[in-house]
Amino acid sequence: DPEMSRGLGDVYKRQVLLPGPPAELIPMFDQQVLPYLDALTPGVICSQMVKLCGVPESQVEDTLKDLIDGQTNPTIATYAKTGEVHIRVTASGENAKAAGKTIKPIVKELKSRFGGDIYSTREETTLEMAVADLLLANDLTVTTAESCTGGMIAARIINVPGVSECYKAGLVTYSNKAKRKFLGVRKSTLDKYGAVSSKTAGEMAKGAALLLKADVAVAVTGIAGPDGGTEEKPVGLVYIGCCVKGELTVKEYHFSGTRSQIREATTSAALILMRSCILTVSYTHLTLPTT
């Protein structure tokens, strides 16, 4: 509704008033404000996103410091996500081709600096999409075994259209009894090391791969809180195991925040570890999908 969005301005400033609810704001911005701004702006402004995973934002910013200092055109901005950092490169030019030409060498430099930590240079590509593309490109099947995340990893993977070609099944083995019955985790392992341990995570991953005859299996076990933590095993302690073609990797993580935040961080970390293990496991040939 044009009456809901009025541009107020003089020769120095223009202001646009918009409603707060995103469902109203976004279409009004796209349909009314953007064309209004385009008409006021000479040339064009283009952006490209470079998405990284598993790298702390502080490390990314340190690596980019020389590029960011004194920047004019293009500009570089970083955005922290759970387990990810997105870098937006923005440039202006007479036309889209000119702006793209300005962006291209910066993206090339980012690829040189961050290498395999970059999972995509497409804004629409999510981490789970990148993992699914890697699985599909190499004809790998995958399964998940989850405790503290309760199916969140499976849900992220199933977000990707066409993933039924590689995703076999997921198990939520929350109790020790379920870990033993379905995944073959040994009673002696649980008695000696506990459900939240590197040993248990490893046996969960191996057991899931064996049970579902999957090339890749990822398993998580942890303490999401707010209760259940001890001095030895505090809230936020998580172990993630990933088995790729029989090669097992288990990592220990310490997350903070609410129960929901810890579970979300664990889910992202599991996808990141899965991607890393697929990329580093011994292959005669690994096909890398276009990012």
Q: Could you tell me what each predicted segment is?
A:
Residues R6, D10-D38, S256-G257, T267-L273:
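Short alpha-helices
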Residues P22-A23, E94, I223:
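Short, glycine-/Ser/Thr-/acidic-enriched flexible segments
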Residues G9-D10, T41-G43, L67-Q71, A77-T82, ...:
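Solvent-exposed alpha-helices and their adjacent loops that cap or buttress functional pockets
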Residues D1-Y12, Y283-T291:
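Single conserved hydrophobic/aromatic residue that forms the stacking wall/gate
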Residues V16, Q48, T249-Y253:
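Structural signal for short hydrophobic segments within the conserved structured cores
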Residues A98-S282, L286:
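Short alpha-helical segments enriched in small residues
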Residues T82, G93-E94, V244-E247:
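Short acidic-glycine loop/turn motifs at beta-strand connectors
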Residues L17-G83, R88-T90, A99-I103:
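Accessory alpha-helical/coil subdomains and C-terminal extensions
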